Amino acid sequence: TLSELRYAEKAGTPKSFAQNDLHIDLQKLKKGDYMLQCFAAFVNLGDKTPGADPLVTALEEIDVFKRIMEKYPEDIAPVYQPSDIRKNAAEGKISGMLTIEEGGCCKGSIGVLRRMYELGVRMMTLTWNHENELASPNVVPGGGHNIWPCTPNTETGLKEKGFEFLAEMERLHIIADVSHLSDKGFWDIVEHSTRPFAASHSNCRALAPHCRNLTDEMIRALANKGGLVGLNYCSGFLDNQPEEKLCRSTTALMAKHAAHFKQVGGIEIIGLGSDFDGIGGKLEMDDCSKLPLLADALRREGFTEDEVEAIFYRNARRFFEENL
């Protein structure tokens, strides 16, 4: 969302966060009864735009976040520490948590990482879809979300600088996000982390064999570490069709993935990741106001009301309150 808003500004066609044509805006968040929304400063290291600088991009998107928080203080407020979530909820405000999707924007500098924390960043992926100074990702040849071919990267994971970043992130209480990370990188995090970590937008590889998804072994390891996984609404990560154009994004498929997560790792690990404003295609739940559709699908899949509430907000609230 921050990336889309920044891009619109630079194109001379700014969008209002109050109401726009994106998956997420303030009106839709209110309609969806959101407790907390993570806002990712997204950086594409493959951007060939002349003069593109990953650090500048991240800082400009963080500036978009700051301006949103300043413009709508009665409706949404930032989260820097666990008490902020409770305070915002008590005041009837949505919590906005700043995250980074592409640790490479820090250019391998621990000093920049510390500055990101000071700016409010509380969760970060080590990579997006490009190798950087920190680690290697799981990527599909040619890009995109196509299921085939999709060979997980089991050879290269965290680099020396990546391990340094992990240690400093844990000291600062910036949550390590393993979505996009290679299989080897995931297991490096499992072995070396001392705090719970998240897979903010990943599904089950057993149901959709995409290398961006988690194997059952990974799900169990994440659960054993006290982690959180966010359901991803992207069709290529939900369906098991061999061609992306055939894949569907339906609430029924999301509920199937939730049921598998529950069976393998337990109900307490499941949250909502969405990847809204980072995915395209035909979505049954096509913006954040449509969450009741997913609640209904979960009930049809056999989830109790208590479990639906756990998935929708309690698990994420507990995870962030314990780990920020």
Each predicted region: which residue ranges?
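Short glycine/proline-enriched coil/turn segments at helix->beta-strand junctions
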Residues: 193-195, 266
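N-terminal hydrophobic targeting/anchoring segments and the immediately downstream early-domain regions
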Residues: 1-152, 209-272, 276-324
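Short loop/helix-cap segments at secondary-structure boundaries that form the rim of catalytic
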Residues: 116, 189-192
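Short, glycine/acidic-enriched loop or turn micro-motifs at the edges of active sites
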Residues: 1, 180-183, 204, 278
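Short, catalytically relevant binding-site loops at active-site mouths
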Residues: 183-184, 203-206, 235-238
